[in-house]
Amino acid sequence: RLVGSEMCIRDSTITFDGIRVVIEESSKGVFDVGLFEEMGGEKEAVVKDLTLAGDMTIDAQKREDGYSLLAGSLAGKFKNGCIKNCTSKVDISFADNKGICTLCLGGLVGDLDSYGSEVEVALRGKVINEGNLTVNPCSDAYIGGVIGRATNYGKIFIKENVCVENKGDLTVQWKADAQPDHSYIGGVVGLFKTNETDIEHLHNWGNIRLDTQNTSATFNIGGVCGELTPHNYERIYPLDLYNAGNIEIKHDLLAEFSAIGGVIGSFGGSSFHQVVNEGKIIVSGKGCKYISGLLGSESSIHGNCYLYSCCVDKVGAYPVWNISYHPVTKQVPCKENHPTNQK
């Protein structure tokens, strides 16, 4: 069991040699799984120039009671500090046949959780996931190629000299009789809820494959983020969000408010610059009305979004976005001369 509070890790290559984690009955209701269970706290953790490789299997099929699992190759939870120039090549698989888990799974970090005005989390340089994530099955999840869930009540810095990339595939099978919960799947981040902030240079090349098993669950799926929304009525300023991976949905999307976007599934309170999609959305069964080339569905609470003309869906099979709640939301000309880290 490794818990990191005040630490610095740098210039290392660590290989996971077939790590297998078995979750059985215990008094615990929350499990953190990764090289470190948890990093950061009152003191910051700093991770620099680290490469993780190998594979990790998480087996929860013997567990009988409901539980939460936060899992990533680096850490189950990251709360305070900096991740700079880190790459994961770890393939992660998870199995929970009973559908009793609330899962936060990311290629690097399961749950990035920033609380308090003195708490800062920064991503710097190249932060990359190249490992594949396989979930079979699950029923309540936040799954992202790099970060499963990011919740920011403190300060999160993902801007300027940074590029957060996912190059691994996400393959998810839902439990056939799962409850109709909301779940979030994104090529880079599953769910991102944040204070007012800039978010820059998030790129996805991995494919997302979901088998819904014809459940009534509500899915928020995006090539980059499953959902990107602010707390309360603050604003987000995303720049250079890019997706080249396909989103493939097998079986029906039965929930009325599922949202599928080439870049972001559910969105709100944002001014979008350089949002670009080159990946296809392939739905083999019954679709839903909120499928869009760039942005799936506008949040009924966090509206008033601006989509600037520098945003492009290069596939063109669907409308660029679905907006229906907020009259101020609109597409507007872009007068900026943007720099970009996009390949």
Regions found by a protein language model. Name each.
Residues 5, 22-39, 60-77, 96-122, ...:
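Extracellular beta-strand/beta-solenoid scaffold signature
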Residues 50, 86, 161, 166, ...:
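Consensus "Asn ladder" position of solenoid repeat domains
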